[in-house]
């Protein structure tokens, strides 16, 4: 079975010939997916108005990416775009803290399957169950496996960091954290301090919020 991790395409010199990893998908299609997803995010997910973020800070906008990750047109784009974002990383499963991470991970699972590849998904509960198997992580076992932690967006980094800790406690190796949008509110610095590689698809400038 083929897993998703691959090395980027290189020239004869061993240097990548493009910023976009070679996935077998035409680069024009990758760019089109990214551009269309950005259009939908701007149209459906960005809410202007005074709001209080999870960090306690006030902001003049809110990025509600559940309107995207649970949208019938956008969800497949999320899967493909996120998959391309981390194509050069070697991992076998993807997941994060419920609820924001769940549709992102599932979209990536389906995108991999559509490409004839294998990618498992898992869900990290906010607390372990008090009944049944009393497990905190749902889905295929991740012990001894390399995993990617995902989230739709992160304000403080708390949710991905909690998910990463839970995954490690379950015996997994966490290779990186990836989100759809970065709000530039301190999450990147928290991930760096924790020794986690961090990637995101869109920044504030691309979202028209800088």
Feature annotation, model-predicted:
Residues 105-148, 155-162:
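Short, glycine/charge-rich flexible loops or terminal/linker lids adjacent to PRPP-binding catalytic cores
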Residues 55, 139-143, 170, 190-191:
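Solvent-exposed alpha-helices and their adjacent loops that cap or buttress functional pockets
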Residues 80, 84, 106, 110-114, ...:
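Short, well-ordered alpha-helices that flank and scaffold nucleotide-derived cofactor binding pockets
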Residues 88-89, 104-119, 189-206:
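Short acidic, glycine/proline-enriched helix-loop-strand junctions
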Residues 90-100, 176-178:
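Short glycine-rich phosphate-binding loop at a beta-alpha junction
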Residues 8-13, 26-89:
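Active-site-facing substrate-recognition patch
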Residues 87-92, 142-144:
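Short helix-loop-beta connector
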Residues 2-12, 26-40, 165-210:
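PRPP-dependent phosphoribosyltransferase catalytic core
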């Amino acid at each position: 079975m083929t897993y998703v991790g691959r090395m980027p395409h290189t020239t004869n010199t061993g240097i990548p010939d493009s910023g976009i990893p070679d996935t077998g998908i035409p680069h024009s299609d990758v760019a089109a997916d990214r551009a269309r997803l950005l259009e939908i995010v701007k149209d459906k997910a960005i809410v202007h108005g005074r709001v209080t973020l999870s960090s306690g800070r006030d902001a003049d906008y809110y990025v509600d990416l559940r309107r995207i990750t649970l949208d019938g047109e956008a969800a497949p784009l999320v899967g493909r775009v996120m998959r391309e974002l981390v194509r050069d990383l070697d991992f076998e499963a993807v997941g994060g803290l419920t609820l924001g991470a769940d549709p992102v991970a599932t979209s990536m699972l389906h995108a991999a399957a559509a490409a004839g590849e294998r990618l498992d998904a898992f869900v990290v509960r906010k607390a372990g169950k008090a009944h049944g198997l009393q497990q905190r992580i749902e889905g295929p076992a991740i012990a001894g496996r390399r995993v990617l932690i995902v989230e739709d967006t992160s304000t403080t980094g708390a949710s991905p960091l909690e998910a990463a800790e839970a995954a490690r406690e379950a015996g997994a190796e966490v290779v990186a954290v990836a989100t759809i949008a970065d709000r530039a509110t301190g999450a990147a610095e928290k991930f760096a301090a924790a020794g986690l590689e961090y990637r995101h698809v869109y920044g504030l400038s691309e979202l028209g919020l800088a």
